[in-house]
Each structure stands twice: as structure tokens, then as C-alpha cells.
């Protein structure tokens, strides 16, 4: 793959849960002065609202209608409490509740509904069309932003991802074991497989044993080398 510019205007990052997409996305967005948008928060937000309103998570039509009638906003951080962004659902700040155990357990089921994905894709594409954005998800490079100038696919073993996620959750005050997280990620991988796509022109990076900074520097190096080729 060769780029015609050193700085891509649109960056797509895909990969399985806890592979480092959010961390890398934020680093790249900060470096280039771009917006960072994690599309997973939309599915989490919809899952949260559906659970709050006791909507049947197996009812694709009801979920799609809820997605269309709800007002979801992803904003820059409004509170300095470690968040990377603020998520509002119908005006309510739900940023941290999105990481609750019940949302974690059910988001893959919600995201697997094709009607739901279609209902939320327009929001994602509109954000991407504006440019100067780093967007992370499962199908960004292949489906949402197929014309993105830089496409990255992050991968890591489920064991590595479980270790990272367990450390992250425990650091936030949620007591959870590595085994619990490993089992949850294994289930999520199975559910997410049908909606996780590797774009043909994506750069694949395996992040096992590599720090976020090492992955970030590797991406910058690849951009520089290919831009000059």
C-alpha cells in the first residue's frame, strides 16, 4: 500500500474487543489534531438505553426503532475524570455506565442485529465524511469508510486482550478476575465474528507484548516510509 500524502485525512481502525483500538485511536487523533470517534460507543449507548427501557434485545425491529428515535451525542470530554469523550443519550451523561457489566454482556447481541447496524451506520458515515477523523470499530475500513486513506487492523491474542481489559477495569474500581474477562471476551469474539472485517488494503498489526506507544510509533513509521516510496 502506498499513500499519496504523509498525513491521511481519514483513519480507520478495526479489530476485536480490547485489541487497543481506543488507545491507538486517541494517540493518533491527538497527534494529528483530529476527532477521535469510537463507533462502539453507539452500540453501547443503544444497549444501555434498551436495558433501561426493558426493550427485548432479541427484537431487531424494536432496537432499530429505538436507535432511530434516540438522540445520541459523542462529545469531547466535559469532565476531567479520565474519560476520552462524553456520551449523551437523550441528554443524559452515560459515559461511565456504558462500561457496566450488564452492557458489556449484552452489547454484542445488540450489535449483531443487521437492522441496528444499518440504523447507526448513517451517523457513523456522516462523521467520517467530514474528514480529519480517526474512527474505530469492527467494520470501519471495509464498510463505513471504505475510502479512508489509512486503514489499520489491530489484533492480539484473547489472553493478551483479557489481561489488558482486566487491568483497565480493576484500575477503575471494578473488581473482576482475569478468568471472568477471558470468558467474556471469548464469548464476545464468537458473537462479533460475523461483523468484524479486515479490509483488503488495511495494515495489520499484532499488539501482543507491545505497548500503546510502540504501536503508535510503528504506525507513524509506516506512514512516513510509504509516503516517501
From Swiss-Prot:
What GO terms describe the biological role, i.e. biological process, of this protein?
A: pyrimidine nucleotide metabolic process
Q: Identify the domain of life.
A: Bacteria
Q: What is its main location?
A: cytoplasm
Instruction: From the UniProt record, list the reaction(s) this protein catalyses.
Output: CMP + ATP = CDP + ADP; dCMP + ATP = dCDP + ADP
Ligand binding (ATP) = 15-23
Enzyme class, top EC level, equals: transferase
Q: What is this protein called?
A: Cytidylate kinase
Q: Which organism is it from?
A: Herpetosiphon aurantiacus (strain ATCC 23779 / DSM 785 / 114-95)
Amino acid at each position: 500500500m502506498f499513500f499519496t500524502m504523509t498525513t491521511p485525512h481519514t483513519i480507520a481502525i478495526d479489530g476485536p474487543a480490547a485489541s487497543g483500538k481506543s488507545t491507538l485511536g486517541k494517540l493518533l487523533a491527538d497527534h494529528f489534531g483530529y476527532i477521535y470517534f469510537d463507533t462502539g460507543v453507539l452500540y453501547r449507548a443503544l444497549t444501555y438505553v434498551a436495558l433501561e427501557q426493558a426493550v427485548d434485545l432479541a427484537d431487531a425491529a424494536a432496537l432499530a426503532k429505538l436507535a432511530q428515535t434516540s438522540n445520541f451525542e459523542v462529545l469531547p470530554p466535559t469532565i476531567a475524570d479520565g474519560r476520552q469523550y462524553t456520551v449523551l443519550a437523550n441528554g443524559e451523561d452515560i459515559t461511565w455506565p456504558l462500561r457496566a457489566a450488564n452492557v458489556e454482556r449484552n452489547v454484542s447481541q445488540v450489535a449483531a442485529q443487521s437492522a441496528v447496524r444499518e440504523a447507526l451506520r448513517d451517523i457513523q458515515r456522516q462523521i467520517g465524511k467530514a474528514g480529519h477523523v480517526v474512527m474505530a470499530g469492527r467494520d470501519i475500513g471495509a464498510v463505513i469508510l471504505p475510502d479512508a486513506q489509512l486503514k489499520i487492523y489491530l489484533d492480539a491474542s484473547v489472553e493478551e486482550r483479557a489481561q489488558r481489559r482486566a487491568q483497565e477495569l480493576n484500575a477503575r474500581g471494578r473488581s473482576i478476575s482475569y478468568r471472568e474477562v477471558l470468558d467474556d471476551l471469548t464469548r464476545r469474539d464468537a458473537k462479533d465474528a460475523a461483523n468484524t472485517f479486515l479490509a483488503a488494503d488495511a495494515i495489520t498489526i499484532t499488539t501482543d507484548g507491545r505497548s500503546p506507544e510502540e504501536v503508535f510509533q510503528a504506525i507513524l513509521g509506516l506512514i512516513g516510509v510509504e509516503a516517501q516510496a
